[in-house]
Amino acid sequence: KFDFASGEVTNDDNDWDIAFRGTSILVNGGSATGLAEEPARSGQGAAAIADGTFASVVSTGALTFSQDSASGPAIIPGSGNGWYNYAGAPTYLISPIPGKILVIRTRDGALAKLEILSYYKDAPSMPNAFSDQSQYYTFNYLYNPNKNSSSLE
């Protein structure tokens, strides 16, 4: 779990904004999706995916936010659906999709945007799904603590 306000990984049951479960990213808002060992939600978090570069996504604009639900996570999982592509044989790599920026409304109504850079430990420049540890997210993010703002600058 990650808390944007502190910029830290957290084990707190309430003070988290996003959680990682394999390639799925959960928000602290909505309801359980049915994934194994997912955290309880206590906030009003939601997510949207914007197309563009990290620098060019500057406002929530016309984005439509969704919360996690029994139908699935707000950030739709699966290769090509949300933030990543899965290569399959022979490399079996998980690679972030360029130009997909996740926009998060935090549990308390603030905003954040994040760009996932790597799914592998230490963000290797040439990842190897067989030798590099997976499920170690590396990302850039910007946090806007102003709850009445749509700015992502």
What are these regions (language model features)?
Residues 108, 118-120, 143:
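A mature extracytoplasmic/lumenal domain signature
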